[in-house]
Amino acid sequence: MCDTCGCNITPGNEHLVRDGGRHARTEDGRAAVSVLRNLLTENDRQARHNREHFDRHGVLAINLMSSPGAGKTRLLEATIEVLGPSCRIAVIEGDLETENDAERIRAKGVQAVQIATGSACHLDAHMVHQALHQIDLDGIDLLFIENVGNLVCPASFDLGQHRNVTLLSVPEGDDKPAKYPVIFRAADLVLCTKGDLLPVLEDFDPERAERHLRALASVAPFDVVSTRRPGELEPWLIWLRDELQAQDTRRALGRTIHPLIQPDGALLHGDAQEGEHHGHGHFHQAAQSHG
């Protein structure tokens, strides 16, 4: 949880803490804990609003999290190549600078909105809301939110997504779930990417990586995938198709689901999180739609 480095203040919410803003109060250039709590409460409100939009339009929103270079963008490219003809997809890309990843996605014929976060090491719900103004939600079935490459902060911020997917690439080492538990506890699915490198990176043991994951009491599926070998994305594609079907069912029943927000972040979220922090698969009644 970034409660000391100040990166809770992002381009999406800085208007709330500027002079005259609703929560304008700082100490020694860093946001006070009470201000951070207020910002997170505002973030949670905006996330609920985002989720209402997704549910009303029948869109499944998935937040992709990983370290830099784990293969998030390449995974999206490969996914679009397979699902694109049958599933309408859009992507929100989060990076500190450049439009490189968004340009790669657009080259696949899919609408993509780039969010440049500046010094912020994660996306927040306000940033995502601003990006949604550039996306026709009636024209898509599936929205991927590619978060900033970071193994800590993204897990503590609800963006309005329905599911979290955490990537662990083979070159990173199989002990990452033990070293960075927060982001792996938040996952509804863990993908071990770059599986084609296993024969040459023999120190990486997928079974050991999964044991580290289970030691966190995670029940998330753990699948080894590769974008370079035909058929090795199938576990991911099956999971996506199942989630799309589940979203259709929830919408018909007027229900929604919330992602896991990790306790270290949730402690600062204040009253907005009371009664909302549930485990995997818990259904919630959707709030009333509004503009």
Locate predicted features.
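Hydrophobic residues at beta-strand termini and immediately following loops
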Residues: 5, 115, 225-226
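Residue-level signal for inorganic ion chemistry
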Residues: 5, 95, 146, 193, ...
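Canonical P-loop GTPase G-domain recognition
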Residues: 197-254
